[in-house]
Amino acid sequence: MRAFKWALAIGATLALPLTAQAQTGGAERLAALLESVTSYSADFDQQILDGGGQRLQEAEGHMWLSRPGKFHWEVEAPYRQVVVSDGDKVYLYDPDLEQVSVRPLDTRVTHTPALLLSGSADALTENYAVESRQGDDEETFTLTPKSPDTLFESLQLTFENERLEGLQMEDSTGQRTAIAFDDIEVNGDIDASRFTFEIPEGADVIREGG
């Protein structure tokens, strides 16, 4: 099951007390955390769970983000998949199928976790209802999309000491995608070539949306 690339575009936090800043304050705090990040790279471990908590799929890889609008998300195991945004187009590459899907970086694609993290934080209050929860060194933000044209029903971002450590998203069926980040580097130098994609010779190209 190759659900990862379509999921893009991702327990204890639910028990944390809800802060008084549930809407505008939570959005402003999250925007401030995201605006302080110009680039972000990390290893990741992803698990997809069904509504009962049964693990359906696990994957691992590396990701790079550069704001605004650029990212490179690469699954290394159990099989390689690559998703790259150059700020104008999004490329989804499946080496096993020798297939590349190319689509514009439009509103629909922006409503995904990767583009949310790499895009403009100012759009948060317009597009999402935001609630915040706080622990000792941990902050968790729950985002509920205001538009139905999204890939998730809710998205949780978890920060520890003001650094993004993980995210969890849930779709309309109750299926959850949980992503934990490790070996994190914030605002480091990332080679610009990470955010370019050259279509491999002989690959089948599917262009969507112009």
UniProtKB/Swiss-Prot annotation:
One of its GO terms (biological process) is lipoprotein localization to outer membrane. It is found in: Periplasm. InterPro entries: LolA/LolB/LppX (IPR029046), OM_lipoprot_carrier_LolA-like (IPR004564), OM_lipoprot_carrier_LolA_Pbac (IPR018323). Keywords: Chaperone, Periplasm, Protein transport, Signal, Transport. Residues 1-22 form the signal peptide. The keyword Iron does not apply. Participates in the translocation of lipoproteins from the inner membrane to the outer membrane. Only forms a complex with a lipoprotein if the residue after the N-terminal Cys is not an aspartate (The Asp acts as a targeting signal to indicate that the lipoprotein should stay in the inner membrane). HAMAP family: LolA. Belongs to the LolA family. Monomer. PANTHER family: OUTER-MEMBRANE LIPOPROTEIN CARRIER PROTEIN. This is Outer-membrane lipoprotein carrier protein.
